[in-house]
Amino acid sequence: MNLSLHDLYIGYDDDASRYVVAEALNASLTGGVMACLVGANGIGKSTLMRTLSGFQSALKGEVCIDGCALEGYTPRELSERVGVVLTEREAMPDLTVEEVVAIGRMPYTNFWGTLTQADRQAVDEALLLVGIGHLRHKKIGHVSDGERQKAMIAKALAQQTDIILLDEPTAFLDYGSKVSVMRLLRQLAHEQGKAILLSTHDLEIAFQTADELWILQHEGLQTGTLDALEQHGAVSAFLAKSGLRYEAEQRRIVFV
C-alpha cells in the first residue's frame, strides 16, 4: 500500500477567493513505516492531514493511493483503505469503549449496522492490540485522555485499513501517555504493516520514534529519515527558526 502526493496545493477555495496554505508538495509513504509530520503552528499540518484524508479537496495536484487519485474512490472504498483519527473529541460520552471501537466496522456492516461474528472479532483484536481490553465496558467519557486516544486508535484498527492518518494524537496527553501512544503506533506500523502518518508538535519524541519525518515549512515539504534530513541540513534549518539545535550524538533537541 502506498500513499503519495504529487505537486499538491492545499488551502481553501470559495466563490470569492482562493487561499493557498502550502504548494508543490511531493511525498510518498509505504506500508510498515510510521512518519511524523512536523512544522510550526499555522503552517498547514491539519489542512494537509484533512486533504490526505479526503475531507478537504486539493486546490491542485493529486493525492493517490496505489497510484489511483482519491477522487477515483467511492466514500466506502476510501473508508476501507484509510483510517482517520482526529484531535477533536467526538460527541459520544455515553458510548462504551467497545461501542466506540465498533464504529470502525461501519464500512463493512449492512444497512442496519449489524455486527457479524467477524466484525466482533475485529473489535476484540483491536482492543487487545492497543492494551485496553479491560476497558471495553467503560464509558468513553469516563476514561483518561490517554485511554481515550488508544480507543480512537483501536477504532481505526478495527476498520482494518492499510493506511492510518492521525492529526495530533498526542495532544493534551501527559508525557508518559505521549510516549506510550507513539510507541504503540510505531509497533503497529512495523508488526501490522500499516502506513501511518501523524502530525505532532512533540519534536523530541517524534525524532526518537519516527521512521521518517515530513517537515512542512513555507519553503515546501521535505521528507526522509532523521539522519538523512540532518545530513542535508534540513533538520538544523527547521529547528533554528525556533531557536533550537539538534545534537545528533545524543539524539536530543536543545535550546540555542
PLM features: residue spans?
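ABC ATPase nucleotide-binding domains
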Residues: 239-256
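The feature captures the beta-strand-to-loop junction immediately N-terminal to the Walker
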Residues: 38-40
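Conserved ABC ATPase "signature" region
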Residues: 102, 117-135
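H-loop/switch region of ABC-family ATPase nucleotide-binding domains
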Residues: 200-201
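Catalytic Walker B motif of ABC-type/P-loop ATPase nucleotide-binding domains
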Residues: 164-167
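Helix-to-loop junction immediately C-terminal to a conserved catalytic motif
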Residues: 53
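Conserved ABC transporter NBD signature motif
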Residues: 61-69, 78
